[in-house]
Each structure stands twice: as C-alpha cells, then as structure tokens.
C-alpha cells in the first residue's frame, strides 16, 4: 500500500503549495487525476543490511582500497559497496497511464495488478518471511547470537523452530499471489537466504 501512502503525501504537499501560492488549482487537479498521474503499489524483498566489516576486509584483501564502512553523525552506516543477497523480488503494480519502460526485463521484477502486489506483500510479511524472524530472532538474541544465519546454522533447535513456523504454520494458510510460489519462496529462504552469514 506504499503507492497509496506516497500519493497521500504528494497530494498533501501539492495542497500546501497551493495554499502558499506556488501552484494553482490546475496543478492540484492534474496531480490528483489517477488517469494521468499514478502511484503504483510495490512489494520489495531483498536483504541489504548495513555494510559488513568482514566484506570490507575481504575486498581489501583482494586489493580494493578504502572499503571500511563509515558511521555518519546520524549513526548511518555507509560504504563504497553494498552487501546484499542474490535473491530479489520487486512486484510492481502495472499502473502507468503515460507508459513505462520494460521494467519486467529486470532480474526479479514482476509486473502485476494491485491485488497481486498486495497478496505478494502479505505472503512475505504475514506468513513466509517476517514471522520466522519474529519468532526466532528475539530468542537468538537471548541465546547470545549476533547473526541470524549463525543462529540457524549452528543451533538445531532454532532451525527446527524456524522451519516449523514457515512450513508447518505458514505454508498451509498462505494466500498464493500467483506470480511467486510460496513453497519456492520458503525453500529459497532455508536453502539460500537464511544460511548466508554475510547478511
């Protein structure tokens, strides 16, 4: 529903601009007309944690200089690299009244209707991915783990619990969005994503 939130924010700004005399009623009408200006809903899933000092060290060992992350005054971590997982999902509502580039040619990009975008988000957030983190992450912290992957890779009981949350509790009740297979999504979590200690 991020498209709806973005639209609401933009319309609020245009109303304030109108009050301040920066734009006229025609501009507000134009931006408000969903047949002309769209705010497509999206679902994205790609883990991109803060820059890893280990990856920075690995890159420097390969001869790449000045890779160490920097912490800004606002406690934001930045680096000249991005450590991210290979799997990525970007589901975009195909609502572009003025045309669009062939976004679906991108790796992991899916064009869909609004209901499918919403189902994809619900699959990820309420059943397949987030519940596993919510159920096991806090216990991992109590048990002294710093990394989710390390916890699952070394603690049989935590892996068993994570698999139960996803396979036994989640998959039987998930609404299939049709463009992403919930079974394949969960299999990928346990075979590729969760074991990745670089994340």
Residue ranges and their predicted role:
Residues 2-199:
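Substrate/ligand-engaging "lid" and interaction regions
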């Amino acid at each position: 529903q991020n498209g709806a939130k973005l639209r609401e924010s933009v319309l609020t700004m245009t109303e304030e601009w109108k009050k301040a005399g920066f734009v006229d009623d025609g501009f507000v009408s134009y931006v408000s007309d969903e047949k002309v200006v769209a705010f497509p809903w999206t679902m994205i899933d790609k883990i991109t944690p803060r820059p890893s000092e280990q990856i920075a060290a690995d890159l420097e060992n390969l001869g790449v200089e000045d890779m160490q992350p920097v912490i800004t005054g606002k406690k934001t971590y930045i680096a000249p690299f991005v450590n991210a997982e290979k799997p990525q999902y970007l589901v975009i509502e195909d609502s572009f009244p003025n045309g669009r580039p062939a976004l679906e040619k991108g790796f992991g990009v899916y064009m869909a209707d609004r209901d499918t975008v919403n189902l994809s988000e619900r699959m990820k957030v309420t059943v397949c991915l987030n519940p596993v983190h919510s159920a096991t992450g806090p216990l991992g912290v109590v048990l002294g783990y710093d990394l989710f992957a390390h916890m699952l890779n070394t603690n049989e009981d935590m892996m068993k619990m994570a698999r139960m949350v996803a396979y036994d509790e989640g998959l039987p009740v998930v609404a299939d969005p049709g463009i992403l297979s919930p079974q394949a999504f969960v299999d990928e979590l346990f075979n590729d994503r969760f074991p990745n200690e670089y994340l």
